[in-house]
Design a protein with these regions (language model features):
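Structural recognition of alpha->loop->beta junctions
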Residues: 95-111, 169-170
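Active-site neighborhood of HAD-like aspartate-dependent phosphohydrolases
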Residues: 9-53
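Conserved Lys-Pro-Asp/Glu-containing loop-to-beta segment of HAD-superfamily phosphomonoesterases
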Residues: 15, 110-139
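Short catalytic/ligand-binding loop motif for oxyanion handling, primarily in non-cytosolic enzymes
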Residues: 25-28, 33, 73-75, 82-86, ...
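Substrate-recognition element of Asp-dependent hydrolases with the DxDx(T/V) motif
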Residues: 55-56, 61-93, 99
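Intrinsically disordered, compositionally biased, charge-dense segments
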Residues: 1-15, 123
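Acidic, Mg2+-coordinating phosphoryl-transfer loop and its flanking beta/alpha structural elements
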Residues: 128-166
Length: 170
């Protein structure tokens, strides 16, 4: 006979964690337009300190968000290391404000970490079920999967929605 937790795990979808930059916020076009070249790690000092508040949404961000919001996702987004200067000091606050402004996501649905810590959310802390990460950075997907999670490599909203449906989301 199955336990209650086994039944719950069978019928409850995994928790979705969604990256911000490159999935719903357009970091690349903003920084490229501002700098006149592709962003590199040497460019942090040339960006406005409130850059994360100024990012435009990705063109299809509202399509993706319109689909995943029914599953009560968390935003799992990385902030620059402290050594990156003033932008790092306010990045967590600006990212939180950006999500509230653009998608009405409250701060308690935000998980803001250094990139290397994203993988710590790959498994559910209670029942060890794998969680899902939607991310445009393949390195994050590989680390997530190595930690036991399910990675969805984001290319565009439609491909991500199709991948989630293949996993079993309605």
């Amino acid at each position: 006979m199955k336990s209650f937790s086994q039944h719950l795990t069978e019928f409850d979808n995994p928790q979705i964690y969604c990256d911000m930059d490159g999935v719903v916020a357009d970091f690349i076009s903003y920084t490229t337009n501002l700098l006149g070249h592709k962003f590199t790690d040497n460019d942090w000092d040339d960006l406005p300190v409130d850059m994360f508040l100024q990012l435009p949404p990705m063109k299809d961000a509202h399509v993706l968000w319109g689909y995943i919001k029914q599953f009560q996702p968390f935003m799992l987004t990385a902030v620059p290391r402290e050594s990156r200067g003033p932008i790092a000091k306010r990045a967590w606050k600006d990212k939180t404000r950006w999500m509230l402004k653009n998608f009405k996501l409250p701060s308690n649905r935000m998980k803001i970490v250094l990139r290397k810590h994203k993988k710590n959310f790959a498994m559910d802390g209670r029942d060890k079920r794998p969680n899902i990460l939607i991310d445009d950075h393949m390195g994050n997907i590989k680390e997530w999967e190595s930690a036991g999670g399910i990675g969805v490599h984001h290319i565009n909203a439609n491909s991500t929605i199709n991948d989630l449906k293949k996993i079993g989301f309605p």
